[in-house]
């Protein structure tokens, strides 16, 4: 008997989000225009689901990134995120290396979870997704694992669950420690967002909101039909 047969249907990650593999993303940039402004830092964390159906952070990657040729650099953005693009200790890599590394990690996780496609999870996700997709287009990296426009926005989800849309406030509501001094580091924000997303998904499960009773009954009918064949 395989692992997937031993673990209940709804406790498998591939069945939790309709075949999507969720990946937490955070970026730090030199502006708001994904086509023109530099992508300066990128972090990502994949997720795994235990045999009881609870979500947990898994693998991570983190890159400081060199501005692409001709990129706009907004001084106000650098002041906000505290990034010194001229600091040699950043260890910055090219966009090509960063996007290649990201996609490789995500594709491995997606395959291991037997998911069909990956989906970006981020706080105010449209911003992060736009920069990842723009960098992928600029670099020409093939086999982009992410859905081109679908996303899970933790700001919206936290607004629904806690009435809070700011990351630090949402984390506080979920009793997740948040150090404001480390905020606007892509890796730290990704770690907090991953914990927040996992908390919301797991809390919904604990409250009895998943699996939804209708979907559970439908799955039972499907299983009965498959057994009868």
UniProtKB/Swiss-Prot annotation:
<dbReference type="InterPro" id="IPR013520">
    <property type="entry name" value="Exonuclease_RNaseT/DNA_pol3"/>
</dbReference>
<dbReference type="GO" id="GO:0000287">
    <property type="term" value="F:magnesium ion binding"/>
</dbReference>
<dbReference type="InterPro" id="IPR012337">
    <property type="entry name" value="RNaseH-like_sf"/>
</dbReference>
<dbReference type="GO" id="GO:0005829">
    <property type="term" value="C:cytosol"/>
</dbReference>
<feature type="domain" description="Exonuclease">
    <location>
        <begin position="23"/>
        <end position="197"/>
    </location>
</feature>
<feature type="site" description="Important for substrate binding and specificity">
    <location>
        <position position="32"/>
    </location>
</feature>
<keyword id="KW-0378">Hydrolase</keyword>
<protein>
    <recommendedName>
        <fullName>Ribonuclease T</fullName>
        <ecNumber>3.1.13.-</ecNumber>
    </recommendedName>
</protein>
<comment type="subunit">
    <text>Homodimer.</text>
</comment>
<dbReference type="GO" id="GO:0045004">
    <property type="term" value="P:DNA replication proofreading"/>
</dbReference>
<feature type="site" description="Important for substrate binding and specificity">
    <location>
        <position position="80"/>
    </location>
</feature>
<keyword id="KW-0479">Metal-binding</keyword>
<dbReference type="Pfam" id="PF00929">
    <property type="entry name" value="RNase_T"/>
</dbReference>
<dbReference type="InterPro" id="IPR036397">
    <property type="entry name" value="RNaseH_sf"/>
</dbReference>
<keyword id="KW-0460">Magnesium</keyword>
<dbReference type="GO" id="GO:0016896">
    <property type="term" value="F:RNA exonuclease activity, producing 5'-phosphomonoesters"/>
</dbReference>
<dbReference type="GO" id="GO:0008408">
    <property type="term" value="F:3'-5' exonuclease activity"/>
</dbReference>
<feature type="site" description="Important for substrate binding and specificity">
    <location>
        <position position="127"/>
    </location>
</feature>
<comment type="similarity">
    <text>Belongs to the RNase T family.</text>
</comment>
<keyword id="KW-0819">tRNA processing</keyword>
<feature type="binding site">
    <location>
        <position position="184"/>
    </location>
    <ligand>
        <name>Mg(2+) 2</name>
    </ligand>
</feature>
<keyword id="KW-0540">Nuclease</keyword>
<keyword id="KW-0269">Exonuclease</keyword>
<dbReference type="GO" id="GO:0008033">
    <property type="term" value="P:tRNA processing"/>
</dbReference>
<feature type="binding site">
    <location>
        <position position="28"/>
    </location>
    <ligand>
        <name>Mg(2+) 2</name>
    </ligand>
</feature>
<feature type="binding site">
    <location>
        <position position="26"/>
    </location>
    <ligand>
        <name>Mg(2+) 1</name>
    </ligand>
</feature>
<dbReference type="InterPro" id="IPR005987">
    <property type="entry name" value="RNase_T"/>
</dbReference>
<comment type="function">
    <text>Trims short 3' overhangs of a variety of RNA species, leaving a one or two nucleotide 3' overhang. Responsible for the end-turnover of tRNA: specifically removes the terminal AMP residue from uncharged tRNA (tRNA-C-C-A). Also appears to be involved in tRNA biosynthesis.</text>
</comment>
<dbReference type="GO" id="GO:0003676">
    <property type="term" value="F:nucleic acid binding"/>
</dbReference>
<feature type="binding site">
    <location>
        <position position="26"/>
    </location>
    <ligand>
        <name>Mg(2+) 2</name>
    </ligand>
</feature>
<feature type="active site" description="Proton donor/acceptor">
    <location>
        <position position="184"/>
    </location>
</feature>
<feature type="site" description="Important for substrate binding and specificity">
    <location>
        <position position="149"/>
    </location>
</feature>
<feature type="binding site">
    <location>
        <position position="189"/>
    </location>
    <ligand>
        <name>Mg(2+) 2</name>
    </ligand>
</feature>
């Amino acid at each position: 008997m395989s692992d997937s047969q031993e673990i209940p249907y709804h406790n498998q990650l591939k069945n939790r989000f309709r075949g999507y593999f969720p990946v937490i993303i955070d970026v730090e940039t030199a502006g708001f225009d994904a086509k023109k402004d530099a992508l300066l830092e990128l972090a990502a964390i994949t997720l795994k689901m235990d045999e009881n159906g609870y979500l947990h952070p898994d693998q991570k990657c983190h890159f400081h990134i060199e501005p692409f040729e001709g990129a706009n650099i907004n001084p106000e953005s650098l002041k906000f995120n505290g990034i010194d693009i001229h600091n040699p200790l950043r260890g910055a890599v090219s966009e090509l290396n960063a996007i290649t590394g990201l996609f490789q990690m995500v594709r491995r996780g997606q395959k291991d979870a037997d998911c069909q496609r990956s989906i970006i999870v981020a706080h105010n996700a449209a911003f992060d997704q736009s920069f990842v997709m723009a960098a992928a287009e600029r670099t020409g990296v093939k086999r982009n694992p992410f859905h081109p426009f679908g996303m899970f926005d933790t700001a919206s989800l936290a607004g629904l669950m806690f009435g809070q849309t700011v990351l630090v406030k949402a984390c506080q509501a979920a009793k997740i420690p948040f150090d404001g001094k480390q905020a606007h580091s892509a890796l730290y924000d990704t770690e907090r967002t991953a914990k927040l997303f996992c908390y919301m998904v797991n809390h919904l499960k604990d409250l009895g909101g998943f699996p939804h009773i209708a979907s559970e009954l439908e799955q039972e009918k499907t299983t009965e039909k498959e057994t009868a064949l």
